């Protein structure tokens, strides 16, 4: 990364933290809670970048295996919907960007056991969504800017692979490590892409050199 790009990235992160810090003064700060013994319904906010979104897939499979019949609603960007909308065990796959009426109606009408934000750092968009969603327990990865509007703050190790960090929620429900790689079957149906069951996933947006 060039010095100019590094400075721009630092400025962007500082700006984002300032916005989220300000939102924390406006939004209701939540008390700490315990995770429920079982999860019957959950809403998950998927990250914006394509690589980060794909790396969420093993977590989704493990979540559905751990809680058969769980109602999973997933929020993502419009350009990432194709990754998730064909997964049979996802009840609703809706885009939060651009903001739209279907998404607004969903987050205002549903009551979830758990809201899960697996993003390791602050996001003003995710903060706004979290504040609007009705959930008994709101869960994030530990971050001083995120924590005020969440009930549960999971370990957030920036030296772990992102896919492993995503699964911190399931570590509280007996998930054994390492997690199992998984892609939906339709990934193998794309022409001239993945032709067999063995694959390598590269995350080009890793935020730490150890990843």
Mark where each language-model region is:
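Catalytic machinery of carbohydrate-active enzymes
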Residues: 1-211
């Amino acid at each position: 990364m060039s010095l100019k790009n590094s400075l721009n990235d630092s400025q962007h992160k500082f700006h984002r933290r300032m916005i989220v810090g300000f939102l924390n003064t406006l939004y209701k700060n939540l008390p700490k809670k315990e995770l429920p013994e079982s999860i019957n319904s959950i809403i998950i906010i998927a990250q914006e970048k394509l690589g980060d979104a794909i790396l969420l897939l093993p977590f989704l499979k493990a979540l559905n295996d751990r809680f058969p019949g769980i109602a999973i609603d997933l929020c993502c960007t419009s350009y990432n919907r194709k990754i998730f909308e064909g997964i049979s065990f996802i009840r609703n796959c809706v885009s939060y960007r651009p903001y739209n009426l279907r998404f607004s109606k969903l987050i205002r009408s549903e009551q979830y056991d758990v809201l899960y934000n697996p993003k390791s750092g602050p996001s003003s968009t995710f903060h706004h969504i979290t504040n609007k969603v009705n959930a008994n327990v709101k869960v994030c990865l530990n971050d001083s800017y995120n924590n005020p509007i969440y009930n549960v703050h999971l370990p957030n190790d920036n030296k772990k692979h992102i896919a492993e960090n995503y699964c911190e929620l399931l570590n509280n429900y007996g998930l054994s490590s390492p997690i199992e790689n998984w892609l939906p079957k339709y990934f193998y149906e794309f022409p001239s892409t993945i032709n067999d069951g063995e694959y390598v996933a590269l995350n080009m947006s890793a935020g730490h050199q150890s990843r």
